[in-house]
Amino acid sequence: MDYGRVYQLNRLMALAQGVSEEQYDKRETWYYDETDNVKHLVLLPEKRVNASENACFVLGGVQAEDIISDDELHTALGKEPGRELKSTKDLRGSFVEILRKDAFQRTFDLVESKRWNVHFIMVQVWYYAFVDVIDSICDDVMLAHNLKAILYRILKSSPEETVKLFGKYHYPDIKDKDKIVFLDGLEAKVLKFIGTVPNPPDKMMASILVKKINEAKKKEELTFIQDETPDEWVKMFVQFYSAEIYSYPNRTLVFDTEKQVEKLLTEDTIEVNGTKLNNYSFSDSATNPMIQVCDYVVSILRKYFIFVDRTLNEIVADIEKFDKQQMQRYRLLNKVLKRSLDNNPLFFHYIASVETQYNINQLMEKYA
């Protein structure tokens, strides 16, 4: 890959969307942890995939120029010195359930008091797995975003049927002889959805998808879902680490130790403008309190992103059931998110349905 070329394109695109040069090029330190990393999404020999339809990979944490000691972090989280800090222990349960956890309050009280910014890459794994279908049948970029969102909703609504259809034809390596029958199967799923969904806008978008599928049957090739690695729905997740490194060469990036990721990055020389990048390092969470903060932050974010991956009406119905404590903590989360986004739009990076992104933004504006 020509990383220098991709860096230039990413930078130009960000500037065109209103990001300032200062925001893009600023020298600052970003700390990272990850959650729900299935390494890649593949069809296994037993004809199932290695991640659920709700899988949500988050690589992120906090941007901070000041750090805290291990003792300070234990105090902030209300823990005895020397006690292990793990979000998996302190934040068990769904998003609604962890709003009752003391660790939720303490984590974002700390982030807010320090004025650290939250940053993340959020990947809806099943969404990312199927975007190439739309990119192969639709040339209209703006329309494609909405078609990807409705396709994602349709395919995750019946995951076993989806795995059966896509697995049968070894997606994303659809052979020429199977192209029509694969598209027929996809069309049948969309028509079934149209027959059951009550929302007129959803029916309309799904109907447009049917039209695009039928038009694709006349194409000579489906560019992005043929002649690819069979049964590999999403390539290795190391790509998300690489993207952070080459997109923002002025940043100092500190990742939680991940031996496989570290090995793969070592094998891949990342150069921008003729210079090999050394703007990143790996640090053991057991000895780096900032990585431990990120562990708590990304754990909460992942649960929140799953919570908002549905219709806005369904989400609001649940929010209206929050008790006083839950609502106070939910507002705190949105306050931190909004402050971070206002400081720099680049703190948030979505590979996700536009519907989910819309939900997050609407709720952030209302509850921050």
Where are these regions (language model features)?
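Phosphate-ester processing/binding pockets and catalytic centers
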Residues: 1-368
